[in-house]
From Swiss-Prot:
Stored Pfam families: ACOX, ACOX_C_alpha1
UniProt main location, coarse: other
Motif (Microbody targeting signal) on chain: 665-667
Ways its activity is controlled: In contrast to other acyl-coenzyme A oxidases which bind to and are activated by ATP, does not bind ATP.
Protein name: Acyl-coenzyme A oxidase acox-3
Example of a GO MF term: fatty acid binding
Cofactor: FAD
Key words of the record: FAD, Fatty acid metabolism, Flavoprotein, Lipid metabolism, Oxidoreductase, Peroxisome
């Protein structure tokens, strides 16, 4: 019954889902992902069921899968072989974030840090990283410091031609470093550099921490595991590390733009501490850029599983009788709960793909050794946008999985739905690489720094240029809802920038110091400013993509998707739009919500085909509720029957207990 029904919904679509997939992802990307999936299907180590593995089992299987991926030799450098790398990491992210993390932390985080902050003296190490002759980890976070990177406490002191690393307190112990607990042979570690009694500030270093033959830690280094975590993160070796007079060669300093001379003098070509920090910030952005994709993938899973299941699930109908029950996807409320996340999955993908292109250009310029004011500005803009997009994407992703689980009713709570595991897997995306509310402050700090330059703001990615013109208040709706939404966002962002800046000035004039001012402007002002700027950029970039799209046959449905995504996001700012004076009276809000309801309804005939265009292969999806054949009940029962007549040992005790109770009641 279910399969023909899902086919019926597929036939409602006005477009070819394969063409849409190719248009959004690129034909080569789709082909490469299919090759990766085929390789995974052919290897028993990638086959799985719905059992919950122990921590040791998870780490063992992640290790074996990682070995197999390395043996495939699909890529060496994520920047010179970008398409292969993204095809592999996206497929692995969908399959298991634990396996993906093992690969990503080594190549894309550790490797990128050494490349971007190192020099020729680190070439041998870079080569070993690319050849997977070593395993890398990235050690920034400490027990007592995460987001406040400038105040980390680990020290690296220059002494007789070497660097001596120390952990001065419990709060300075490095932690949350993936790959560190058991596997890492080398790490990028951040510490305060002390030369001739002076603290030269926050610097990056690369050091060996284990012997690659015995895997024993080197003298002066203690490494341990951080214990159990929910979901796939059990498979990630998050470790802690403590230094006690560990000596490393001077070459450990990642010396692009700074160095220590043989006679012990600190030298730097950076013009300021902020310029030096911007290079590090650009490096840190790579992690946040990857986490944006996690938000996209979460929305993809949520909408795929819940929408497909909503076709198979029939409940109630206009007249009594089981034969008259209708799919729950027909209910407008079910559509309203799920379709916005379907639109988010597609739009965030388009946005993230463009952002990756910009970031790759930025990183290549850094690696080539360029130093310019324009590149420094590029770094700040990358940092501002990644610090805004990571929270927006991950909040949507985690939210979508929670809504999907509830929209699937009781069956959604089964392990075989995969929705619960996915919620556990994606929940930490809101805190790692920067707690969301904290890093939004980094976005607003950069935007507020532009407040005095309105009229002449120029940035490499042009994400802030709209602030140069004072926007108008709402007058009327046009025939293009996306243009209307962007106009509202421009007003909202401009107004929030002006009012937040004015409030900061007022607080400073009242005697508050900069720290107090920065904290007091966050609620309802700076946080909203960062979110508005980010969402405007997301919508604008997707609109640009649609203007340039080659396959015109899929443009109309993508326009419907963008209409829904933009209206869905803007509706969340409705109260602020009224408070700021963008509109008055109830009609603007009523019209906005009516347009949102219509945008949801317009997507119903397209929904299953849109899901097909974004859904991973069933082997990767691994959900009984969300399989592409629409046979949810059959897949559920297939799993149920695996547990037929399995009697646990305690049933004998139960029988004896009931017998005693029965005998007692007769007395």
């Amino acid at each position: 019954m279910s399969a023909p029904l899902i086919d019926k919904y597929r036939k409602m679509a006005t477009f070819d889902w394969k063409k849409l997939k190719a248009a959004v992802e690129g034909e080569e990307h789709v082909r490469l992902k299919s090759e990766v999936v085929a390789k995974m299907k052919s290897e028993p180590v990638f086959h799985r069921d719905y059992r919950v593995l122990s921590r040791e089992e998870q780490r063992e299987v992640v290790h074996q899968r990682w070995k197999k991926i390395v043996e495939w030799g699909l890529f060496k450098d994520p920047y010179s072989d970008l398409e292969n790398f993204h095809a592999l990491t996206e497929t692995l992210e969908a399959y298991d974030q634990g396996t993906s993390a093992r690969l990503f932390l080594h190549g894309n985080v550790f490797g990128a840090a050494v490349k971007s902050m190192g020099t020729d003296r680190h070439k041998d190490l870079i080569q070993k990283t690319e050849n997977n002759e070593i395993v890398g980890a990235f050690c920034l976070t400490e027990v007592g410091h995460g987001s406040n990177t400038a105040e980390i406490q680990t020290t690296a002191t220059f002494d007789n031609g070497e660097l001596v690393f120390n952990t001065p307190s419990v709060s300075a112990i490095k932690c949350w470093a993936g790959n560190l607990a058991h596997s890492a042979t080398h790490v990028v570690v951040y510490a305060q550099l002390h030369v001739e009694g002076k603290n030269e500030g926050f610097h990056g270093f690369v050091i060996q921490v284990r012997c690659p033959r015995t895997f024993q830690t080197l003298p002066g280094i203690t490494i341990g595991d951080m214990g159990s975590k929910p979901g796939c993160w059990q498979g990630v070796e998050n470790g802690w590390m403590e230094f006690k007079n560990h000596r490393a060669p001077l070459s450990a300093l990642l010396n692009k733009g700074c160095d220590i001379t043989p006679d012990g003098k600190y030298v730097t070509s950076f013009k300021s501490a902020s310029e030096k920090q911007s290079v590090s910030l650009g490096t840190l952005s790579v992690g946040r850029l990857g986490i944006i994709a996690k938000g996209m993938m979460a929305c993809t899973f949520a909408s795929t599983i819940a929408i497909r299941y909503s076709v198979a699930r029939r409940q109630f109908g206009p007249v009594k009788g089981a034969e008259n029950e209708i799919p729950v996807l027909e209910y407008p409320l079910q559509q309203y709960r799920l379709f916005p996340y379907l639109s988010a999955a597609i739009c965030i993908r388009i946005f993230q793909k463009k952002f990756v292109g910009h970031f790759t250009e930025y990183m290549m310029r850094v690696i080539m050794g360029e130093k310019s004011d324009e590149l420094s500005e590029f770094s700040k803009e990358v940092h501002a946008l990644s610090s805004g997009a990571k929270p927006v994407a991950t909040w949507l992703g985690v939210e979508s999985l929670g809504e999907a689980r509830k929209a699937c009713g009781g069956h959604g709570y089964l392990q075989m739905s995969r929705l619960n595991t996915l919620r556990d897997d994606n929940d930490p995306s809101q805190t790692f690489e920067g707690e969301n509310f904290m890093i939004l402050q980094q976005t607003s700090n950069i935007l507020l720094g532009k407040a005095q330059s309105i009229g002449s703001i120029e940035t490499p990615m042009s994400t802030m240029s709209f602030l140069n013109q004072k926007p108008s208040k709402f007058s009327s709706w046009s025939s293009n809802p996306v243009n209307d939404v962007l106009s509202a966002y421009r007003y909202l962002t401009y107004h929030l920038l002006q009012t937040t800046s004015a409030e900061a000035y007022r607080l400073k004039a009242s005697g508050k110091n900069s720290f107090e001012v920065r904290n007091e402007i966050q609620i309802h002002r700076a946080v909203n400013l960062s979110v508005a700027y980010t969402e405007h950029t997301m919508i604008h970039w997707v609109q640009q993509f649609l203007k340039e799209i080659e396959d015109q046959s899929v443009k109309p449905v993508l326009q419907k998707v963008l209409n829904l995504f933009s209206l869905f996001l803007l509706e969340r700012h409705l109260a602020t739009l009224y408070i700021t004076g963008y509109a008055s009276g109830g009609k603007f809000g009523e019209d906005l919500r009516e347009k949102l309801r219509l945008a949801v309804a317009e997507l119903k005939p397209e929904a299953i085909a849109l899901v097909d265009s974004i859904a991973p292969d069933d082997f990767i999806l691994h959900s009984a509720l969300g399989a592409s054949d629409g046979k949810a009940y059959e897949h559920i029962m297939e799993e149920f029957r695996k547990y037929t007549n399995e009697q646990p040992r305690w049933v004998c005790d139960l029988a004896q207990f009931l017998q005693k109770r029965s005998q007692g009641s007769k007395l």
